[in-house]
Amino acid sequence: MIDKEKIIEGIKLFLEGIGEDITREGIKETPERVAKMWEEFEKERSFDFKLFEEYSNYSEMIIVKDIPFYSMCEHHLLPFFGKAHIAYIPNKKICGLSKLVRTVRAMALKPQVQERLTEEIADIVQKELEPMGVGVVIEAEHLCMSMRGVRSPGHCTVTSSLRGNFLSDIRTKEEFFKLIRQ
């Protein structure tokens, strides 16, 4: 649960700390806007991971690719954004495809690093579906590298997390990587 008042006070202190007049017309409502944004994010992080067991005989790879997302780098509080690809091989359970999209959104809507985001998505799919295997790939641009530091806009950082057949069977891994590139 978030503490809206602490967020408001923290943003006021931050703005004053960088020399802004917190009574200025364009800024005076910013602390409340930021708190409201984080409240909205918190609401989106909760969802029901509905399973469908009536398709228990399906045993080929299921992929949802090019899932757009945005997150916040926990080191600099700057956005990173891109797309995620999720695949799994069912073991008697499948989920509504939107649940994979919601999983990406839910895990991304908090201060995060891309490596952990990739692992958390794979963890949830593994826990909820108990599949034969899971593959997650995330491609993202980090504004903390584009706007500051090395100032390298347009880069793409790629992370992956593989479980089960995706890790142990080279053909499954190759099929996954080939399909997400098509």
From Swiss-Prot:
It catalyses: GTP + H2O = 7,8-dihydroneopterin 3'-triphosphate + formate + H(+). Belongs to the GTP cyclohydrolase I family. Its EC number is 3.5.4.16. This is GTP cyclohydrolase 1. Keywords: GTP-binding, Hydrolase, Metal-binding, Nucleotide-binding, One-carbon metabolism, Zinc. Zn(2+) binds at C73, H76, C144. Homomer. HAMAP family: FolE. InterPro entries: GTP-CH-I_C/QueF, GTP-CH-I_N, GTP_CycHdrlase_I, GTP_CycHdrlase_I_CS, GTP_CycHdrlase_I_dom. GO terms for cellular component: cytoplasm. The gene is folE. NCBIfam families: folE, PRK09347.1-2, PRK09347.1-3. Pfam families: GTP_cyclohydroI. PROSITE patterns: GTP_CYCLOHYDROL_1_1 (PS00859), GTP_CYCLOHYDROL_1_2 (PS00860). GO terms for molecular function: GTP binding; GTP cyclohydrolase I activity; zinc ion binding. Pathway: Cofactor biosynthesis; 7,8-dihydroneopterin triphosphate biosynthesis; 7,8-dihydroneopterin triphosphate from GTP: step 1/1. GO terms for biological process: one-carbon metabolic process; tetrahydrobiopterin biosynthetic process; tetrahydrofolate biosynthetic process.
